[in-house]
């Protein structure tokens, strides 16, 4: 699905933007702090209904404005669809072809055909940072693969909050009543993540070998569940094992007022040559591993959807060494995908530019076309 046109109003520092992107590469040029990332976030928000950065929704509204709005026309096999989302004091509302979600349009219909993958400098820290970032990567990638994950993850968070509150102040009976919905939602999320990792692992190995060469150690990916929960079983058995882990840890959880087993405590393990890349990989190897992981995600979606996802690359080239940047740009140039790239230095992305590349300058929230 291609983004044909984009309208942004009062989103972050963007007062009013009308964009006609290229069907291939659209490059956003400008100094830091001018609004390039905000424009990428507007596209990401439109395609996922979630902010790119962890903020309150109210922070997406431009200072002094009453609300923010993003809308786009997407062309796919079924024709052109218009999706839109608005953020105001009352929260977030979205619509498909003018029909609000929940009253004329379904969430599944909204997300049909919409898939976007974002790659930012923060992602390059994925290997050596804490597990929170790796869990966010998993859940965002799982949502792209199966949009129903959005509702499933929300169900798990609600159940987790309820059980944690019961652990702190409720009776044993109250805690037990919240445990079953937590187990059900947790097992569903565990299985989604497990299945995603199984799909990504061989693609990661292939991409890393291509980036790093035949002499490099083999890359691998594994899902590590907290509390000793083994996830290599049917969903019902995973649920039973999660329930046993919660029962075993019940007294400890009561003392701490916190659930210590479940998807919110799990981790994604990236390895090189059988050793954890977080401890044993060099910075160059870690960055190559993250690049391979992103390519694995893109290729996995390409295989599942029959086309590549929309790509959002936020100044990644400035953080990669020349060899890895050449590899990334060569990959993008060969991929039949629509991509949006931000940069402060046009020279860094020139190898990926083609005759149909669109260039825009972003300055103080104003987006203006440039002659290529």
Curated annotation (Swiss-Prot):
Cited Gene3D superfamilies: P-loop containing nucleotide triphosphate hydrolases, RecF/RecN/SMC, N-terminal domain
Disulfide bonds: none
Alphabetical keyword list: ATP-binding, Cytoplasm, DNA damage, DNA repair, DNA replication, DNA-binding, Nucleotide-binding, SOS response
This protein's record includes keyword DNA-binding: yes
Pfam families from the UniProt entry: SMC_N
Family annotation (InterPro entries): DNA-binding_RecF (IPR001238), DNA-binding_RecF_CS (IPR018078), P-loop_NTPase (IPR027417), RecF/RecN/SMC_N (IPR003395), RecF_2 (IPR042174)
Domain of life of the native organism: Bacteria
Keyword match Lipoprotein: no
Localization, UniProt: Cytoplasm
Transmembrane segments: none
GO biological process: DNA replication; DNA synthesis involved in DNA repair; double-strand break repair; SOS response
GO cellular component terms listed in the entry, alphabetical order: cytoplasm
Listed GO MF terms: ATP binding; single-stranded DNA binding
Residues binding ATP, per UniProt: 30-37
Family assignment from sequence similarity: Belongs to the RecF family.
Function, as annotated: The RecF protein is involved in DNA metabolism; it is required for DNA replication and normal SOS inducibility. RecF binds preferentially to single-stranded, linear DNA. It also seems to bind ATP.
Name by which UniProt lists this protein: DNA replication and repair protein RecF
Organism per entry: Anaeromyxobacter dehalogenans (strain 2CP-C)
Gene: recF
């Amino acid at each position: 699905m291609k983004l044909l046109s984009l309208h942004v109003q009062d989103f972050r520092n963007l007062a009013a933007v009308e964009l006609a992107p290229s069907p291939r590469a659209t490059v956003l040029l400008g100094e830091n702090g001018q609004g390039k990332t905000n424009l990428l976030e507007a596209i990401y928000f439109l395609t996922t209904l979630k902010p790119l950065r962890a903020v309150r929704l109210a922070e997406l509204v431009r200072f002094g404005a009453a609300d923010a709005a993003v809308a786009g026309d997407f062309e796919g096999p079924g024709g052109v669809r218009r999706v839109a989302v608005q953020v105001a004091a009352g929260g977030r509302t979205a619509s498909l072809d003018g029909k609000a979600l929940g009253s004329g349009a379904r969430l599944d219909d909204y997300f049909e055909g919409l898939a976007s993958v974002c790659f930012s400098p923060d992602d390059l820290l994925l290997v050596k940072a804490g597990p929170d970032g790796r869990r966010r990567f998993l859940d965002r990638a799982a949502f792209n693969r199966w949009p129903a994950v959005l509702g499933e993850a929300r169900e798990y968070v609600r159940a987790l909050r309820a059980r944690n509150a019961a652990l702190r102040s409720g009776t044993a009976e109250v805690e037990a009543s919240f445990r079953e919905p937590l187990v059900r939602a947790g097992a569903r999320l565990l299985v989604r993540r497990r299945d995603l990792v199984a799909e990504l692992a061989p693609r990661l190995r292939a991409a890393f070998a291509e980036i790093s060469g035949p002499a490099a150690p083999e890359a691998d990916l594994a899902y590590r569940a907290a509390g000793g929960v083994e996830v290599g079983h049917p969903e019902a058995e995973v649920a039973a094992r999660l329930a046993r882990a919660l029962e075993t840890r019940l007294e400890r959880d009561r003392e701490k007022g916190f659930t210590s087993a479940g998807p919110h405590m799990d981790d994604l393990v990236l390895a090189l040559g059988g050793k954890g890349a977080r401890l044993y990989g060099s910075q160059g190897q870690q960055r190559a591993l993250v690049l391979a992981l992103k390519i694995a995600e893109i290729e996995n979606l390409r295989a599942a959807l029959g086309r590549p996802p929309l790509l959002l690359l936020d100044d990644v080239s400035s953080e990669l060494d020349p060899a890895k940047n050449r590899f990334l740009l060569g990959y993008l140039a060969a991929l039949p995908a629509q991509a949006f790239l931000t940069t402060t230095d046009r020279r860094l992305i020139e190898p990926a530019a083609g005759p149909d590349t669109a260039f825009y300058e972003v300055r103080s929230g104003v987006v203006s076309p440039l002659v290529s």
